[in-house]
């Protein structure tokens, strides 16, 4: 988030080893270089019913999109998913960004909603959407059938699962002409937009089979039905060996040599 009045940019770093471990060593006043910006602002339409589907760190992005959608007269139904109960943060901001929230957690006992009209669910996010759409969670303050737009942000596997579920177990609860996009988390490198092609993402037309390529750094919001998630998974794994070596080397330096 950005506070223009104070000139502050707020960031959230996920502790996964390697460079994230270096972030733990930062002290107030240390210089930090941010590269970018990449991507394109998410398109927000007026007076729609919008379904936000967030997994893990994706929720750090979605609450700003939800706030913008509500400001444009949209109804916002938010499925916020987490692996563990300790992973949840920015609860007040998420609540302010949605009319109705389904808090999903893989870990029991899950979350207890603090607002009337919100729900808690133990299980994955697709299961939560099915439970909500079927009425298993109770009356729907916002009907899933009214959804004009679905915006999914999270891991590549979560977005792929949502994309597939729309045509299978979620199909009875969605109208045919809804529009679904995902914020594609392609690997980045140059941060200069359409230069290095590290973020190149294959698309496959479901009707013709034609394959095209786009730069995710130019526009991260891509139609779920077009994205080749197998290709994305391969791209995300391409630096796996180097990333593991870097993580072990930094861990060795920080914990064993210090």
Q: Where are the predicted features?
A:
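FAD-binding FR-type
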Residues: 1-51
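Cofactor-binding loop segments of dinucleotide-utilizing enzymes, especially the Rossmann-like FAD-
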Residues: 14-16, 37, 55, 81-83, ...
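Short amphipathic alpha-helical segments
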Residues: 24, 47, 64-66, 91, ...
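Short, glycine-rich nucleotide/cofactor-binding loops
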Residues: 49-59
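Structural beta-sheet core signal
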Residues: 51-52, 77-80, 103, 152
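Histidine-anchored nucleotide/phosphate-binding helix
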Residues: 59-70
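Conserved S-adenosyl-L-methionine
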Residues: 69-76, 99
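Reductase modules of NAD(P)H-dependent flavoproteins
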Residues: 86-258
């Amino acid at each position: 988030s950005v506070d223009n009045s104070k000139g502050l940019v707020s960031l959230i770093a996920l502790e996964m080893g390697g460079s994230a471990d270096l972030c733990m060593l930062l002290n107030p006043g240390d210089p930090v270089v941010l590269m970018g910006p990449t991507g394109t602002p998410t398109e927000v339409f007026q007076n729609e019913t919008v379904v936000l589907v967030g997994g893990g760190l994706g929720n750090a992005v979605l609450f700003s999109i939800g706030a913008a959608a509500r400001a444009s007269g949209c109804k916002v139904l938010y499925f916020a998913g987490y692996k563990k109960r300790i992973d949840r943060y920015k609860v007040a901001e998420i609540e302010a960004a949605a009319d109705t929230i389904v808090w999903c957690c893989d870990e029991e006992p899950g979350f207890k909603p603090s607002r009337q009209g919100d729900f808690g669910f133990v299980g994955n996010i697709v299961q939560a959407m099915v439970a909500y759409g079927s009425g298993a969670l109770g009356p729907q303050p916002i009907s899933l059938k009214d959804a004009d737009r679905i915006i999914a942000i999270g891991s590549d596997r979560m977005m792929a699962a949502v994309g597939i579920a729309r045509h299978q177990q979620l199909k009875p609860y969605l109208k045919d002409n809804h529009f679904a996009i995902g914020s594609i988390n392609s690997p980045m490198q140059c941060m200069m937009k359409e230069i290095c092609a590290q973020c190149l993402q294959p698309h496959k037309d479901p009707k013709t089979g034609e394959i095209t390529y786009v730069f995710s750094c130019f526009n991260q919001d891509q139609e779920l039905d077009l994205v080749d998630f197998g290709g994305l998974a391969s791209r995300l794994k391409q630096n796996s060996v180097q990333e593991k070596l870097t993580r072990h080397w930094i861990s060795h330096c920080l914990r064993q040599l210090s």
